[in-house]
Curated annotation (Swiss-Prot):
Sites where the protein binds NAD(+): 120-122, 175, 195-197, 238, 257
Main enzyme class: translocase
Localization per record: Cell inner membrane
Function: The transhydrogenation between NADH and NADP is coupled to respiration and ATP hydrolysis and functions as a proton pump across the membrane.
Quaternary organization: Heterodimer of an alpha (PntA) and a beta (PntB) chain. Alpha subunit serves as the dimerization unit.
Gene Ontology BP, a term: proton export across plasma membrane
Upper taxonomic lineage: Bacteria, Pseudomonadati, Pseudomonadota, Gammaproteobacteria, Enterobacterales
Protein name as it appears in the record: NAD(P) transhydrogenase subunit alpha
Example of a GO cellular component annotation carried by this entry: plasma membrane
Designated gene of the protein: pntA
Reaction equations catalysed: NAD(+) + NADPH + H(+)(in) = NADH + NADP(+) + H(+)(out)
Length: 510
């Protein structure tokens, strides 16, 4: 089957549904790829790069003659007319907000897969395009805030005086929120974050931010991986928290969204008016109405007291190269599910919950919404039950047996000491102490330090190898035992270096 990559015609859209790297992966699945001329120009991918990757460059509407169409945005009306019956379209669709679009696509007797309808389950993470774009949006939000903010993010002490660090508050600790937290923290800002879901507290703290909590308990999970609408009492408590924080922080990033509903208003005009002059608010929910009452979608609005409210709706498109690569990879992972035989043909299997969730129209029949998939939150740690007190069974062994074994061991040691060389007692004492000390040292080391501990064992094994090599030329059993010692110690050395090398690779960026 042929995959077509048309040029995105939506105003200000810079992304493309495939990159040269993803084209190579599509070819390995058995597909042929046709790219409309100039489709990747705004994302820094020219036609030559696509040709080198193995794609065919086509002109005009011929790309729409492909059996599979990969796009970023939903097709326009004139593009829908170019879809042939039986074609499979994959793009962002937003079926809840676009019922007329769904009807028009169904009338063309096509199959439509919406990348915004990927189920929030672990198995579908590799094709979760919303998370990919949210990650970029959160990062870019901090970049835009830093551009508009008039000071450093990090604190400094210079000859000209002390520069205080910027204070950043992130509302919503989803993918976008965590990306914003990481970017702001890496720039040296003091970061604090709030989320209605208490289970994300550890994630926020692991990113180096302070987690803001309310003295209010309420279940925030909705069962589908998203937050739900909270009670009036909870909203009142969080609004009081935001009002207090607005007077302290310099930058606010809001990411709160509820699927299928307008974005909740979390930052009121009074809160913005109480902020310091030069402060910045980045509203990632601007496209759905915004979390701030001052937000103007697609623009920067400056209030009378000098607070800038950024309402850009194209933050992922402001990093087009990265966005296209991540989105293209999400599409490749979806096609891997559809084409398990790698023969260039796809199978829409509704027994697969991921494919069922993504497919909103199947052969002209609207199949959205898919049956809900319940997603369980991370379970709370259960309180440990008091250990049961068990009465120890009395040993039926006779006490003389233990004393007899101890006496036998003493007699055996005395006999060996009488017939062995004088140096034996010294060597045996050192050996016994080494066994005791080594046992307690190794078993009291934390599991996280076992890999670094291998460097010490490598040194000890090296000493064993040296000692064995000095004895290996004596012949007889001595040579045989020396060879065994060299073999076992060498295995420990090479294995230790291999594991240590793997550990060190985990700390490298490349």
């Amino acid at each position: 089957m042929r995959i077509g990559i048309p040029r995105e015609r939506l105003t200000n859209e810079t992304r493309v549904a495939a990159t040269p790297k993803t084209v190579e992966q599509l070819l390995k699945l058995g597909f042929t790829v046709a790219v409309e001329s100039g489709a990747g120009q705004l994302a820094s991918f020219d036609d030559k790069a696509f040709v080198q990757a193995g794609a065919e460059i086509v002109e005009g509407n011929s790309v729409w003659q492909s059996e599979i169409i990969l796009k970023v945005n939903a097709p326009l009306d004139d593009e829908i007319a170019l879809l042939n019956p039986g074609t499979t379209l994959v793009s962002f669709i937003w079926p809840a907000q676009n019922p007329e679009l769904m009807q028009k696509l169904a009338e063309r007797n096509v199959t439509v897969m919406a990348m915004d309808s990927v189920p929030r389950i672990s198995r579908a993470q590799s094709l979760d395009a919303l998370s990919s774009m949210a990650n970029i949006a959160g990062y870019r939000a901090i970049v835009e805030a830093a551009h508009e903010f008039g000071r450093f993010f990090t604190g400094q002490i210079t000859a000209a005086g002390k520069v205080p660090p910027a204070k950043v508050m992130v509302i919503g600790a989803g993918v976008a929120g965590l990306a914003a937290i990481g970017a702001a923290n890496s720039l040296g800002a003091i970061v604090r974050a709030f989320d209605t879901r208490p289970e994300v507290k550890e994630q926020v703290q692991s990113m180096g931010a302070e987690f803001l909590e309310l003295d209010f308990k309420e279940e925030a999970g909705s069962g589908d991986g998203y937050a739900k609408v909270m009670s009036d009492a909870f909203i009142k408590a969080e609004m009081e928290l935001f009002a207090a924080q607005a007077k302290e922080v310099d930058i606010i990033v809001t990411t709160a969204l509820i699927p299928g509903k307008p974005a909740p208003k979390l930052i009121t005009r009074e809160m913005v008016d109480s902020m310091k002059a030069g402060s910045v608010i980045v509203d990632l929910a601007a496209q759905n109405g915004g979390n701030c009452e001052y937000t103007v979608p697609g623009e920067i609005f400056t209030t009378e007291n000098g607070v800038k409210v950024i309402g850009y709706t194209d933050l992922p498109g402001r990093l087009p190269t990265q966005s296209s690569q991540l989105y293209g990879t999400n599409l490749v992972n979806l096609l891997k599910l559809l084409c398990k035989e790698k023969d260039g043909n796809i199978t829409v299997d509704f027994d697969d919950v991921v494919i069922r969730g993504v497919t909103v129209i199947r052969a002209g029949e609207i199949t959205w919404p898919a049956p809900p998939i319940q997603v369980s939150a991370q379970p709370q740690a259960a309180q440990k039950a008091a250990p049961e007190v068990k009465t120890e069974e009395k040993c039926t062994c006779s006490p003389w047996r233990k004393y007899a074994l101890m006496a036998l061991a003493i007699i055996l040691f005395g006999w060996m000491a009488s017939v062995a060389p004088k140096e034996f007692l010294g060597h045996f004492t050192v050996f016994a102490l080494a066994c005791v000390v080594g046992y307690y040292v190794v078993w009291n080391v934390s599991h996280a330090l076992h890999t670094p501990l291998m460097s010490v064992t490598n040194a000890i094994s090296g000493i064993i190898v040296v000692g064995a090599l000095l004895q290996i030329g004596q012949g007889g059993w001595v040579s045989f035992l020396s060879f065994i010692a060299v073999l076992i110690a060498s295995i420990n050395i090479f294995g230790g270096f291999t594991v240590t090398q793997r550990m060190l690779k985990m700390f490298r960026k490349n």
